[in-house]
From Swiss-Prot:
Protein name (record): S-adenosylmethionine synthase
GO CC field: cytoplasm
Biological processes annotated in GO: one-carbon metabolic process; S-adenosylmethionine biosynthetic process
Gene from which the chain derives: metK
Main location, first listed in the record: cytoplasm
Lineage: Bacteria, Pseudomonadati, Bacteroidota, Bacteroidia, Bacteroidales
Region called Flexible loop, residue ranges: 98-108
Keywords: ATP-binding, Cytoplasm, Magnesium, Metal-binding, Nucleotide-binding, One-carbon metabolism, Potassium, Transferase
Top-rank taxon, per record: Bacteria
Subunit structure: Homotetramer; dimer of dimers.
Length: 430
């Protein structure tokens, strides 16, 4: 019997994602001026306020207020009626120095033997049901909101859009785990109050709300969806769109109050959106605001890199990779593989795990170097998912009143590169 599977995404203007982006913007600026920075930056955003807290060890000085305001303005919180606006919100910092005990436990004379920054288990997942080796439900949920943000920034249609939004996509699968069709799409988007009631009566207000909701629903189906579909070039995925899709658009009705004014946002509260949308597994550690000595982040990226390259090489159609660490110890405690019975090689999952251990150095410093993680590459990861993104080289310029400006060429989403496929094929005789 087939089944339904659902994943959700949230926009860059969702309060938790605002917090993630501020935390990663702080991390990026510190890494730009001091690549050896140790950073754990947490952010809280609420009505008219930003609170930064955490632990940092660095030689760099950065303007935290300016960083936070630039991120908020870039996202689109630029109007006072949002009750959270980049130029006027308060920014409070309680960031202090990293624990000397943790630092002693992690650093080593030989950098390659640098210990893990904490204990824990991290997971990487990949499936061949999409071209970027991501679960289809999450991939589509991200695409919906990325296109919605493009429409908002263009300002030509759907001009009532505000930054906060969520999406959810449900896919029907057959008995063999293959996508059959898209079952349900949910889009909730914050908006201006763009229909004025005829008078102050409750009935007039209700009628105005119904007009707004009808317009938003129409625009999602007639403007947003065609643009999303036009950006999909995989014929198998395009065939899943059908006239039976159930659309829920702003199902609670009016959504004017939103963003950090509607809900307080915190760093690290969207870890399933950040990863695989509920497929695979998650070790529980968030990513944003953490430098790569924190294996919560770096080892999760490494595990994704492994899983994606293994699936792309044809070892399996689907793969989950787990690694775990003890704080202060460089080598992982274990490597675990689950191919869900979809392996294409005559090896057990345990034997596949042993080959992974031979192919990939999973010491934290080796991961940092292989994936070029000591660079300011993180703000881009903090919205629309850390996984399944397109690797690319960009040039960034960082200015500071405390340091000379720095222009750096950096590579984004290195863990998404298919640079180990040939080595894996050779190792597995494929």
């Amino acid at each position: 019997m087939g089944y339904l599977f659902t994943s959700e995404s949230v926009s860059e203007g969702h309060p938790d994602k605002v917090a993630d982006q501020i935390s990663d913007a702080v991390l990026d600026k510190l890494l730009a001026f001091d690549p050896s920075s140790k950073v754990a930056c947490e952010t809280l955003v609420t009505t008219g306020q930003v609170v930064l807290a955490g632990e940092v060890k660095t030689k760099a000085y950065v303007d935290l207020q300016r960083i936070a305001r630039e991120v908020i303005n870039r996202i689109g919180y630029t109007k006072s009626e949002y009750m959270f606006e980049g130029n006027s919100c308060g920014v409070f910092s309680a960031i202090h120095e990293q624990s000397a005990d943790i630092n002693r436990g992690v650093e080593r004379e030989d950098p390659m033997n640098q210990g893990a920054g904490d204990q824990g288990m991290m997971f990487g997942y990949a499936t061949n049901e999409t071209e970027n080796y991501m679960p289809l439900s999450l991939d589509l949920a991200h695409k919906l909101l990325m296109v919605l943000a493009e429409i908002r920034r263009e300002g030509k249609v759907m001009t009532y859009l505000r930054p906060d939004a969520k999406s959810q996509v449900t896919i029907e699968y057959d008995d063999n785990g293959k996508p059959v069709r898209i079952d349900t799409i949910v889009v909730s988007t914050q908006h201006d109050e763009f229909v004025t009631p005829a008078d102050s009566s409750k009935e007039a207000q209700l009628k105005a709300d119904e007009e707004m909701l009808a317009k938003i629903r129409q625009d999602v189906i007639e403007i947003l969806m065609p643009r999303v579909i036009a950006g999909i070039h995989n014929e198998e995925v395009l065939a899943l769109f059908n006239d039976r899709i159930v659309y829920h658009v702003n199902p609670t009705g009016k959504f004017v109050i939103g963003g950090p004014h509607g809900d307080t946002g915190l760093t690290g509260r969207k870890i399933i959106v950040d990863t695989y949308g509920g497929k695979g597994a998650h070790g529980g550690g968030a990513f944003s605001g953490k430098d790569p000595s924190k294996v919560d982040r770096s080892a999760a990226y490494a595990a994704r890199h492994i899983a994606k390259n293994m699936v792309a090489a044809g070892v399996a159609d689907e793969m989950l990779v787990q690694v775990s660490y003890a704080i202060g110890v460089a080598r992982p405690i274990n490597i675990y593989v689950n191919t869900y019975g979809r392996s294409n090689v005559k090896l057990s999952d345990g034997e596949i795990a042993k080959k992974i251990d031979e192919l990939f150095d999973l010491r934290p410093k080796a991961i940092e170097e292989r994936l070029k993680l000591r660079n300011p590459i993180y703000e881009e990861t903090a919205s629309y998912g850390h996984m399944g993104r397109e690797p690319k080289v960009v040039t960034k310029t960082y200015e500071s009143m405390y340091h000379e400006a720095k222009t750096l060429e950096v590579e984004l989403f290195t863990w998404e590169k298919l640079d180990y496929v040939d080595k894996i094929k050779e190792a597995f005789g494929l």
